[in-house]
Design a protein with these regions (language model features):
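N-terminal alpha-helical targeting/anchoring segments
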Residues: 1-135, 153, 157
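TRNA-recognition modules of translation machinery and tRNA-sensing kinases, especially anticodon-binding
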Residues: 27, 130-429
Length: 429
């Protein structure tokens, strides 16, 4: 969440940033925060003054008793008792203001970085780079869902029978290709310096709150109510929460972690034509990269993450472009975000396969993820960053469509050592 210091010292900048993100009622929300913080500080000042007066009077009681002025001592005791009652009232007022303040802050999104373009939605995002060659397919080229049926690679209907829409079953060589992609992505992350972790697939409320999924995306997450646990929408949540309530040493930055996980999202099924085949699922596999760094180094960290993801797409021989998201299309928590999209040749459209975001200190403030300066031992909030490297379903869709032949689907050369075959076909064994 945004820091009170930022909101109070740079109020106009915060309001303009929230308006750039098309956050409704930006000015009212900020003013409410400042008003509530003033109530909290006023209660604190009154409480401090009240305690000071009570302590001063308490000292008088002993002196009066010593001088034999019992009645006067009792009168002072009565006044001290009133101060103590006032203490309770002021403490309650302060606690209520603090709780209200926390609620207000956690419902205000991060503000965009200066370089984020103005815009309302995805139509206003800016293409900043393109790469690869778009394949020219014959007119009778098939979309990936038809190819999967033709070569017996993915059974969408069987997934519906067992669970429901958005839970496909991968078969034979396709299951092996899934494993190959996961292994390839993790190995490339390791080569880039990321330490692999294998996180839990369910998290508690504190973890969801720490990375900003809660309360913002509560309706999009699967909730195991009996245990009050949430299925993760991305490995970002458990991996970043490793560093919740942690003070890192400056020498240990940047922290670099990667993780493969299944991801679960209830939002699938509400996007019309986007839901066909692998385009949008309830359950999918993804490799996530996470970096935690000093504020002055986070821009460079973001750049390195973008280069890493771009390198993966180049090695997979997929045509891609990189989009700088406009203010209105950014997530609740991000300060700046780039999306990677690959060309799906049969669908003739771009498919998002990665978002790489810098959150500034927004997540770190919720997580209380800090670091200690080496020289003066000052403690400061870290900056957190993460990105998909990569999400599998749409990568698989693009590989299938772009590399189709009458005999099967050509496997990208970089994956052959990981899967052991060069062609995806119905010869599954």
């Amino acid at each position: 969440m945004l820091t009170l210091k930022l909101i109070s010292e740079e109020t106009e900048r915060v309001i303009k940033g929230l308006e750039k993100k098309h956050f409704k009622g930006a000015k009212d929300a900020v003013e409410k925060v400042l008003e509530t913080d003033k109530r909290r500080r006023d209660a604190q000042q009154k409480l401090d003054k009240n305690k000071q007066e009570a302590n001063s009077m308490s000292k008088q009681i002993g002196m009066l008793m010593k001088d034999g002025k019992t009645q006067e001592a009792e009168e002072v005791k009565a006044k001290v008792a009133v101060y103590k009652e006032n203490d309770k009232l002021l403490q309650t007022q302060m606690a209520e203001a603090e709780q209200e303040l926390t609620t207000l802050l956690c419902n205000i999104p991060n503000i965009p970085a200066d370089e984020v373009p103005e815009g309302k939605d995805a139509n206003d995002n800016v293409v900043v780079k393109e790469g690869g060659v778009i394949p020219q397919l014959p007119e009778d080229a098939l979309c990936h869902w038809d190819l999967c049926k033709k070569f017996n690679l993915i059974d969408f209907d069987l997934g519906v029978k067992i669970t429901g829409a958005g839970f496909p079953i991968y078969i034979g060589k396709m299951a092996r290709l899934q494993r190959a992609l996961e292994a390839f992505f993790l190995e490339e992350a390791r080569k880039s310096g990321y330490l692999e972790v294998q996180p839990p697939l369910v998290v508690n409320q504190a973890s969801g709150y720490g990375t900003g999924q809660l309360p913002d995306k509560e309706g999009q997450m699967y909730h195991a109510e009996q245990d009050d646990l949430y299925l993760i929408p991305t490995a970002e949540v458990p991996v970043t929460n490793i560093f919740r309530d942690v003070i890192l040493d400056e020498k240990d930055l940047p922290v670099m972690r990667c993780a493969y996980s299944a991801c679960f999202r209830r939002e699938a099924g509400s996007y019309g034509k986007d839901v066909r085949g692998l385009n949008r699922l309830h359950q999918f596999d993804k490799v996530e990269i996470v970096r935690i760094d000093k504020p002055e180094h986070s821009h460079e960290s973001h750049k390195k993450m973008l280069e890493h993801v771009e390198g993966l797409l180049q090695k997979l021989e997929l045509p891609y472009h990189i989009l700088l998201l406009c203010g209105g299309d950014m997530s609740f928590t991000s300060s700046i975000c780039y999306d990677f999209e690959v060309w799906s040749a049969a669908q003739k459209r771009w498919l998002e396969v990665s978002s790489v975001s810098n959150f500034g200190n927004y997540q770190a403030n919720r997580l209380k993820c800090r670091y200690r300066h080496a020289e003066d031992k000052k403690i400061e909030l870290c900056h957190t960053l993460n990105g998909s490297a990569l999400a599998l379903p749409r990568i698989v869709a693009a590989i299938i469509e772009n590399n189709q032949t009458p005999e099967g689907i050509r496997v990208p050369r970089v994956l052959v050592p990981y899967c052991g075959f060069e062609m995806l076909d119905d010869k599954n064994f």
